[in-house]
Swiss-Prot record:
Taxonomic source organism: Mycobacterium tuberculosis (strain ATCC 25618 / H37Rv)
Protein encoded by which gene: drrB
Pfam families: ABC2_membrane_3
Keyword match Membrane: yes
Protein name: Doxorubicin resistance ABC transporter permease protein DrrB
Primary subcellular site in the record, as a coarse category: membrane
GO cellular component, one term: plasma membrane
């Protein structure tokens, strides 16, 4: 008597399930690539690329020329030990301002898609809710990379230099891009909620400028009024600038070193922003557009 036949259906089911998962991954990748091309193509014609290139130049000129004389008179120039030159001091802030303005494009695209009902059509498709958002952020991160490169070139012209090894240079660039990605994600959520493309520039640029001016990116903490020292010292832009200066290094004896006390506040701010944005995205994307 022959033994009972073995049912092969579980193995088939497992294989089919694995193939289905792999197919979904490939489908999501293709969807992101198609959406990336859709979002990136108009930016080549609407002036966004020109703005991405021009913003770092304008910021560098706008910060360097007015602060060149006060830098020598009130800070003390290179002899003060604050920084070897003004270019070394302000370039980290300019890189942050550049990627911040590049991130605004993600909010503009999200607001436009929400206003025109494109997000509603996306929701009716077999597509993960995060896919359009991540595609828009992908485009913004590309623009952030462009802004970073232009900022470093401008900084090099006025005296900025990296004084540490290649690993620190990579860390500097990755930190700037990570900050740009977080800001792009936040701008996208704001644009999705407001559905007002015209409001994106003032709504997102004013906080960036205010926090940048009230930071140690332009002048040392001692030159601010005492009553605002706690805010200036602890706000995220100041902490980001301090971390970037440590990664860039300097020739002065008082140059910040890359250490846990210097980097921890920056990593804490980034982690807090990621948590807040993750929670916010679940609420925003769960809404019917």
């Amino acid at each position: 008597m022959s033994g009972p036949a073995i049912d092969a259906s579980p193995a088939l089911t497992f294989n089919q399930s694995s193939a289905s998962i792999q197919q979904r991954r490939l489908s999501t990748g293709r969807q992101m690539w198609v959406l990336y091309r859709r979002f990136a193509a108009p930016s080549l014609l609407n002036g966004e690329v020109l703005t991405t290139v021009g913003a770092p130049i304008i910021f560098m000129v706008g910060f360097y020329i007015p602060f060149a004389i006060p830098w020598n008179q009130f800070v003390g120039g290179a002899s003060s030990g604050v920084a070897s030159n003004l270019g070394q001091y302000i370039t980290p802030l300019v890189t942050l301002q550049a990627v911040s303005f590049a991130a605004i494009g993600s909010g503009f695209r999200a607001a436009t898609d929400s206003l025109l009902g494109v997000n509603r059509r996306f929701q009716s498709m077999p597509m993960a809710p995060l896919t359009p958002l991540l595609a828009r952020v992908w485009v913004a991160v590309d623009r952030c990379f462009t802004g970073l490169v232009i900022s470093l070139v401008c900084g090099y012209v006025i005296g900025f230099r990296f004084h540490r090894g290649a690993l620190y240079i990579v860390g500097f660039c990755l930190l700037v891009i990570a900050i740009g990605a977080v800001l792009s994600f936040a701008a996208d959520l704001v644009g999705t909620v407001t559905r007002n493309p015209d409001a994106m520039l003032p709504l997102l640029s004013l906080p960036i400028l205010i926090f940048g001016l009230l930071s140690i990116g332009l002048m040392p903490l001692k030159l601010f009024p005492h009553w605002i020292h706690p805010f200036v010292r602890n706000q995220p832009i100041s902490q980001f600038v301090a971390a970037l200066r440590a990664l860039a290094g300097d020739t002065t004896k008082t140059a910040s070193q890359v250490s846990w006390p210097v980097m921890a506040p920056t990593l804490t701010w980034l982690f807090a922003f990621v948590v807040i944005l993750a929670l916010s995205s679940t609420i925003v994307l769960a809404r019917r557009p």
